[in-house]
C-alpha cells in the first residue's frame, strides 16, 4: 500500500543544464551515499533522521538541505512518516559558471551547513523548481536560479579550497580513481587490496572512514551517476544501464 503511494519525478532542464526532482510518499531508508553534484533541496512533508558527515539530526517540513559534491549522507523515516522532498542537482562546472555570473569571480562554493532549519530560502528553491516544471522562459528560470544562489552564497557558503576538506590517503585516493575509470568492471576486494599495502579488513575500515562510504557503495554511486549522465545524453535506458 505504501509503495503504491511513492512517486519520483525527475526533470532535466537544458537551458540551465541542471536537474530538478521531487520525491513524494517515500517511506524507505536511503543508505549511505553521495552525489557528484551540488544538491539544494527542502523537505515539504514528513520527518527524517539524517546522518551527514558524522553528524545527525531530524529534518522536517520547511528545512533546507544543502549537500556539497561527495558529502556522504543517509536518512531514515521517523515514526514511519512519508517523505515529500524537492531539490535541484547542479553539476560543479555549472555551479562555477553561475557563481561567476553572480560574483564576477570563478570558484566552486562550499556549503558550510548541510541543514538550515525553517529556512525562507526554501521558497526560492520551490520557485526554481516550479519554473522548470512549467517550462517557463529562459529568463525567468535564470532569474530564479541566480536569486537562489545569491542567497546561499551570502549566507551559507564560502569559496572552496583544498583546506576545506581533508584529503584521503594517497593509496585510498588511487583506489577511488581506479574505480572511477573501471566502474563497469566486475571489481573484487582482492583486486583492490592488491593495489595497496593494506589487508582486506583494514582497507574496508580505512576507505569507509576517509571517503565516508564503503568501496562497494562508492562504486555503486559512480555507476548510478554514469548511467544518469548517459540518459541525459539521450542514450536509451537499457543501453545506459548496460554501459554503467
Predicted regions and their residues:
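Short amphipathic alpha-helical/adjacent loop interface patches that line ligand
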Residues: 92, 145, 172
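Basic/polar phosphate-binding segments, predominantly the helix-turn-helix DNA-binding elements
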Residues: 174, 178-182, 186-226, 230-235, ...
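Residue-level recognition of specific faces of alpha-helices
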Residues: 39-42, 171, 218
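Generic structural signal for secondary-structure transition and capping sites
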Residues: 48, 137, 157, 184-185, ...
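Sigma70-family region 2
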Residues: 76-78, 155-156, 208
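N-terminal regulatory/effector-sensing and dimerization cores
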Residues: 2-108, 134-137
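Amphipathic alpha-helical segments enriched in hydrophobic/aromatic residues interleaved with Lys/Arg
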Residues: 102-164, 177
Amino acid at each position: 500500500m505504501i509503495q503504491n503511494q511513492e512517486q519520483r519525478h525527475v526533470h532535466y532542464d537544458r537551458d540551465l543544464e541542471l536537474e530538478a526532482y521531487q520525491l513524494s510518499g517515500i517511506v524507505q531508508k536511503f543508505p549511505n551515499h553521495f552525489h557528484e553534484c551540488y544538491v539544494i533541496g527542502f523537505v515539504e512533508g514528513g520527518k527524517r533522521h539524517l546522518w551527514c558527515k558524522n553528524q545527525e539530526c531530524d529534518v522536517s517540513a520547511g528545512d533546507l538541505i544543502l549537500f556539497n559534491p561527495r558529502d556522504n549522507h543517509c536518512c531514515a523515516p521517523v515514526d514511519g512518516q512519508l517523505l515529500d522532498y524537492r531539490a535541484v542537482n547542479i553539476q560543479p562546472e555549472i555551479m562555477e559558471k553561475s557563481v561567476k555570473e553572480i560574483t564576477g569571480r570563478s570558484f566552486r562554493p562550499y556549503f558550510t551547513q548541510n541543514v538550515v532549519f525553517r529556512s525562507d530560502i526554501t521558497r526560492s528553491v520551490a520557485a526554481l523548481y516550479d519554473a522548470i516544471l512549467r517550462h517557463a522562459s529562459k529568463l525567468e528560470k535564470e532569474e530564479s536560479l541566480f536569486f537562489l544562489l545569491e542567497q546561499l552564497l551570502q549566507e551559507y557558503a564560502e569559496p572552496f579550497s583544498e583546506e576545506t576538506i581533508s584529503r584521503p590517503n594517497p593509496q585510498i585516493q588511487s583506489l577511488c580513481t581506479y574505480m572511477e575509470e573501471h566502474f563497469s568492471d566486475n571489481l573484487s576486494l582482492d583486486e583492490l587490496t592488491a593495489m595497496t599495502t593494506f589487508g582486506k579488513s583494514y582497507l574496508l575500515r580505512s576507505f569507509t572512514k576517509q571517503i565516508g562510504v564503503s568501496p562497494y557503495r562508492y562504486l555503486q554511486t559512480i555507476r548510478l551517476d554514469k548511467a544518469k549522465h548517459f540518459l541525459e545524453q539521450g542514450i536509451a535506458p537499457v543501453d545506459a544501464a548496460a554501459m554503467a
